[in-house]
From Swiss-Prot:
Signal peptide location: 1-23
Record-marked site positions (Cleavage): 513-514
InterPro entries: Gp120_core_sf, GP41-like, HIV1_Gp120
Protein name stated in the entry: Envelope glycoprotein gp160
Stretches the record annotates as MPER: 659-680
Statement: the UniProt record of this protein carries the keyword tRNA-binding: no
GO molecular function: structural molecule activity
Length: 859
């Protein structure tokens, strides 16, 4: 027990020393390759040179590279700011292109309408349109079929148009006027009141404010890409198994811009996509059945739509300031239609096989026949879901896909065609928000458009026996496929980590490592490296970061200068201009934050703040900065507050230290501010002496009271008994003075002021003597101690010298022995090697000697 008691203080001492030595402090690193998810606006870039493209986007220079990163990152195509911005921006471009602007609420009146046919003499006659009968069976066409040119393929009819009459107030508000207008039958809701005429209204005119386009605009496809603003960058999952959601994508690349993509706006299918490959793959939502299927490019799938016939558009002025457009009927227009080219049946079979192999749908799909492509729509469904909706040269086509579905599903006893009849509507449901727009009647002349089919929008419902691929009207899903493998992140170059180095302590200098001058993405090349290796290059990385940010923001600045006039009045132009200052604002914000911690313009900044969580320590050899930041992000607020408090205290200490340092300059003693301080000091000394006098007086009065003695008739302050002074012998008694003052008595005393001065001098003398004796005693004791230590160390000098000499001699002997041993081993090795070589040569020569002996014998 005594043994442990004697060792306990030593153990406690060692624990205390180890705790002091191993204490961790917060170290601030600037320029680390770390990031966090961001939601800032992206910049649009395009190669289109038409007015629409140049007004909406910046010119694309095509100089964008990708860098492979050795990291793991999570990606989600549906929870993604890049895809959401694409949907919003394309809708904005869509509205800008076709822009409905005239309210048509006044046209919500009853109209008398009739289905109309015309003869060549323009004498219209009202008849009932007979439905077109279509024979059942298979009928496919190809590019050489003459019906394509003549628009006379089997089953295609004429567009149903209704001529309507209605009354409205014209320029005279109190007087009704008769108007005539022509509508597509699909845009009207009618009640059959007579045999040939109907009472009709515009569809949904009572539920929505409808607008008409001011002018007919083109909706041509626009190829564009997104670019990250300065200080941000894009990550892309480059894994071929990525299907819209992957929490751990290990094949990640970084870039400043996305790939080029097309502006798409259609239901059922995606056109001219950039993600199509020589395989079929599925993007699926993590929580529901929303999917988008990328179709195989091997089958060369395409769609060719056409609207035949000539049409004219004339204005109708209804009331003052309101102009509505109509089309006079010259001839019943032929029906618009779309032709599907390519090996569609095999493409759909491959889609089914892909679904069967997919791990999410294995439970329902047993074979290809159990997977069906269907169009599920109930009563009252939007026409964009019931029909395939697309935009062809500014016209909105609604195609009945029944023949097409029968063809690809190979349904017997049905009408199977590789083309679909379409009709054109003027009242359109908006695909991005709830609402309706009305557009001008179809443009004059023949319209046609061709597109490559690259994807299928669907909802996949699976049960125990079948799996249904239900086509969908979610236009936004197209951009999940195009940009779902990207994510926008913001660089966070400031990081915290614990080290055992405290501020202002001696630190071994770091070995400098040569770093190549890289661009902005080169800064991210170290993202997959260990923290220890990255910290060695922070100085160069921080310079690369700033230079890359400046270079990155210079690109939009240059292109903005080229198009300053066009960009002045556009929304996207304003967004692009705002992105210019993002980088500098971010850099200044980081430097201001570093300055508040006392780490301005430092790449590695040691502090005096203890590390708040000793259980969290980084693995400098195997952990990346991004992994470390994810572990300690919850400590950022606490560390930031501690660093700010430490910096405030440090500034106070530095201020006090500077005040002390100013005393050693002799000229500062004669400064005006110094004299003011001296005056203050003098006033304090006088006040102190007064207080000291009062205290001494009180103390002495108390002391005399304790002795029971006090001068009776002494004038205060009288500290001693009055000194008796005898009368002069030569002075006459009772001699009156010149003034008749009489005798002044036999005794008198010195004035009390002189006695007080004597007392004060005695006190001061005693104080100085005490200070002198104390200092002299302290110096003598110190000298005696030092002399004693020196005397005690004197005998040790000779043994220490002998010991040093012995150590040096021993080292020299070891070196000599090592040299001798090396030489001996080398000589022995050479001798052994030579002996082995000779023995080997002798063994090898045995067959030759035998042969030579035999030859001699035979000779």
């Amino acid at each position: 027990m005594a043994y442990f008691s004697s060792r306990l203080p030593i153990a406690l001492l060692l624990i205390g020393i180890s705790g002091f030595v191993c204490k961790q402090y917060v170290t601030v690193f600037y320029g680390i390759p770390a990031w966090r998810n961001a939601t800032v606006p992206l910049i649009c870039a395009t190669t289109n040179r038409d007015t629409w493209g140049t007004v909406q986007c910046l010119p694309d220079n095509g100089d964008y590279t990708e860098i492979r990163l050795n990291i793991t990152e999570a990606f989600d195509a549906w929870d993604n700011t890049v895809t959401q911005q694409a949907v919003d921006d394309v809708w904005r471009l869509f509205e800008t292109s076709i822009k409905p602007c005239v309210k048509l609420t006044p046209l919500c009146v009853a109209m008398n309408c009739s289905k109309t046919e015309t003869n060549p003499g323009n004498a219209s006659s009202t008849t009932t349109t007979k439905p077109t009968t279509t024979s059942r069976g298979l009928k496919t066409i190809n590019e050489t079929d003459p019906c394509i040119k003549n628009d006379s393929c089997t089953g295609l009819g004429e567009e149903e148009i209704m001529q309507c009459n209605f009354s409205m107030t014209g320029l005279r508000r109190d007087e009704l006027k008769q108007y005539k207008d022509t509508w597509y039958s699909e845009d009207l809701e009618c009640n059959n009141t007579r045999k040939y005429t109907s009472r009709c209204y515009i569809r949904t005119c009572n539920t929505t404010i409808i607008q008409e386009s001011c002018d007919k605009h083109y909706w041509d496809s626009l190829r564009f890409r997104y670019c990250a603003p300065p200080g941000f960058f894009l990550l892309r999952c480059n894994d071929t198994n990525y299907s819209g959601f992957m929490p751990n994508c290990s094949k990640v690349v970084a870039s400043s811009c996305t790939r080029m993509m097309e502006t798409q706006s259609s239901t059922w299918f995606g056109f001219n996509g950039t993600r199509a490959e020589n395989r079929t793959y599925i993007y699926w939502h993590e929580k529901d059945n929303r999917t988008i299927i990328s179709l195989n490019t091997y089958y060369n799938l395409s769609i060719h739509c056409k609207r035949p016939g000539n049409k004219t558009v004339v204005p109708i002025r209804t009331v003052s300031g309101l102009l509505f457009h109509s089309q006079p009927i010259n001839k019943r227009p032929r029906q618009a239609w779309c032709w599907f080219k390519g090996n569609w049946t095999e493409a759909i079979k491959e889609v089914k096989r892909t679904i069967i192999k997919h791990p999410r749908y294995k439970g329902g799909a047993k074979n290809i026949t159990s997977v069906k492509l269907v169009s599920e729509h109930g009563k009252g469904s939007d026409p964009e879901t019931t029909y395939m909706w697309t935009n062809c040269r500014g016209e909105f086509l609604y195609c009945n896909m029944t023949w097409f579905l029968n063809w690809v599903e190979n349904k017997t006893n049905t009408t199977r065609r590789n083309y679909a009849p379409c009709h054109i509507r003027q009242i359109i449901n908006t695909w991005h928000k709830v609402g309706k727009n009305i557009y001008l009647p179809p443009r004059e002349g023949e319209l046609s458009c061709n597109s490559t089919v690259t994807s299928l929008i669907a909802n996949i419902n699976s049960d125990n026996s079948t799996t249904n691929i239900s086509v969908s009207a979610e236009v936004s899903e197209l951009y999940r496929l195009e940009l779902g493998d990207y994510k926008l992140v913001e660089i966070t170059p400031i990081g915290f980590a614990p080290t055992d180095v405290r501020r202002y302590s001696s630190v071994k200098p770091r070995n400098k490592r040569g770093v190549m001058v890289l661009g902005f993405l080169g800064f991210l090349a170290m993202a997959g490296s260990a923290m220890g290796a990255t910290s060695l290059t922070l100085s160069a990385q921080s310079r690369t970061l700033l230079a890359g940010i400046v270079q990155q923001q210079q690109q939009p600045v240059d292109v903005v200068k080229r198009q300053q006039e066009l960009l002045r009045l556009t929304v996207w132009g304003t967004k692009n201009l705002q992105a210019r200052v993002t980088a500098i604002e971010k850099y200044l914000k980081d430097q201001a934050q570093l300055n508040s911690w006392g780490c301005a313009f430092r790449q590695v900044c040691h502090t005096t703040v203890p590390w708040p969580n000793e259980t969290l320590t980084p693995n400098w050899n195997n952990m990346t900065w991004q992994q470390w930041e994810k572990q300690v992000h919850f400590l950022d607020a606490n560390i930031t507050a501690l660093l700010e408090e430490a910096q405030i205290q440090q500034e106070k200490n530095m201020y006090e230290l500077q005040k002390i340092n100013s005393w050693d300059v002799f000229g500062n003693w004669f400064d005006l501010t110094s004299w003011i301080k001296y005056i203050h000091l003098g006033l304090y000394i006088v006040a102190g002496l007064v207080v000291l006098r009062i205290v001494v007086y009180i103390v002495q009065m108390l002391a005399r009271l304790r002795k029971g003695y006090r001068p009776v008739f002494s004038s205060p302050p009288s500290y001693t008994q009055q000194i008796p002074i005898r009368k002069d012998r030569g002075q006459p008694a009772n001699e009156e003075t010149e003034e008749g003052g009489g005798n002044d008595g036999d005794y008198r005393s010195w004035p009390w002021q002189i006695e007080y001065i004597h007392f004060l001098l005695r006190q001061l003398r005693n104080l100085l003597i005490w200070l002198y004796n104390g200092c002299r005693t302290l110096l003598l004791k110190t000298f005696q101690i030092l002399h004693q230590i020196s005397t005690n160390l004197q005998p040790l000098r000779l043994p220490v010298a002998y010991l040093q000499y012995g150590i040096s001699w021993f080292q020299e002997a070891l070196r000599a022995a090592a040299r001798a041993t090396g030489e001996t081993l080398a000589s022995a090795g050479e001798t052994l090697w030579e002996a082995l070589r000779r023995a080997a040569r002798a063994i090898i020569a045995i067959p030759r000697r035998i042969r030579q002996g035999l030859e001699l014998t035979l000779l």
